[in-house]
Amino acid sequence: EYIREKIKSTGITAKRLVLHFQTAEDGKYYLRGPNGGFWRCSRFIDDSTTYNETDDLGIIEECGKAFGDFQLKLADFPVKQLYITIPHFHNTVMRFEAFDNAVKENAAGRADEVKADIGEYKALEETATEMYKMQRRGELPLKVTHNDTKCNNVLFDKCSGQYLCVIDLDTVMPGLVGFDFGDAIRFIANSAKEDEKDISKVSLDLDKFEAFAKGFIGKVGAELTENEKNTLALGAITMTIECGVRFLTDYLNGDVYFKTEYDEHNLDRARCQLALAKDMIKKQSEMKNIVAKYL
């Protein structure tokens, strides 16, 4: 509703540019199912499509625009009004505490075989927790964030390829802009699949990074604080390490959280994210230069 009113205030029809949720007979935007579940319904947006993955730099730039515009339109939303659907979701300090506990408890008896992986992730802990600690010190503001900034959470016009709106709003919570930016980069600019076994294929695609950064910063760059601008590249590194350490934690715990297709699936995922994070660190200066280019 907030975004819809923002769009309408510009004189543009909001019909295809924001999700419209239907109300139930009691006026609420959800319905309780017979088994106690919650359901809601949004209007179908005609002539729209999504992309699970893409190499099209134009689409990637549009994806960046979509999430940047999402940030822009909600920049003055009272963030404290948001309900926290997943507590401590990007609390990287707690993610590493959970990792340490998984190593110590060794529930699945796998710790010895992945000592090298454990050591490499522990070496990245300070990097991964820097932005969270900055936020706790008041150096980075909490804003409205999407928290699942994948390309497939944007609707695009089938004909023009331009973005229409951001979807899948279940995880909208207070968070850091750099984490939304970073998680998108982790997903869209990886040269390989998330569970690629051959880590020699894993790297940060700087062309894709630039395409997304151009779109994102072009929309919301002027609204960012200096610290937010300076940590966009670090956000990509942080989200990649966090994702990887979660995969390795789950592997050590016996694959109890993430759905897996084979015994070492979480380990392959963790190693892939580790390789990507290490390549990002090597290319951090290049990432920062690209960010600065569009600010």
Task: Identify the residue ranges that each predicted region occupies.
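Conserved ATP-binding subdomain of kinase catalytic cores across diverse folds
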Residues: E1-F99, V177, I188, K193-V202, ...
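Regulatory N- and C-terminal appendages and interdomain linkers associated
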Residues: K8-T10, A14, G161-Q162, R246-L295
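Catalytic activation segment of kinase domains across protein kinase-like and atypical kinase folds
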Residues: G138, N152-K193
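Active-site activation/catalytic loop segments of kinase-like enzymes and analogous catalytic loops
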Residues: P174, G178-A222, T238-Y257
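Small/polar glycine-rich anion-binding or flexible loop at a beta-alpha turn
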Residues: K229-M239
